[in-house]
Each structure stands twice: as structure tokens, then as C-alpha cells.
Amino acid sequence: MIWFYAKQGHHLRCEIRHLTDGDQFDLVITDADGSERVEHFSDSASLTRRTLQLEAEWFHQGWDGPFGREY
């Protein structure tokens, strides 16, 4: 699952990758400058909490979104 956020012509990308080893996930965040960071989660509940936290932070910073895309 991939989400995009937009602000004044800049974009953030947030991707969730379900790993093949059990209930594990990577959250890949690509910032507007192209830098990328990865956060690892060992369960979906932790991933959901972090995703909601990021959405709230980005909303308060003026980012529009999320705009989703499934693949």
C-alpha cells in the first residue's frame, strides 16, 4: 500500500511493505527531498499506531492527504 501527501508542490510518499516472515512490516517514508527512511514493525497494531501518528503530524504541518494507491 502506498500513500502520497502534498504540500506546496512537494510530495511525501509512505509505503507499507508486508514482509514474508510472519506478521512483520516495513514502513518506508520518502521525504520531499528524496531521502528515505525505514521503520520496522513486528505486528500490524504497532504499524497502525505509527501510521496514524504520522498522519496527524503531517496534517498539522499542512500536508494534504493521504492519497492512496494499492498495487
What is each model feature region?
Residues 67-71:
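Intrinsically disordered, low-complexity charged/polar segments
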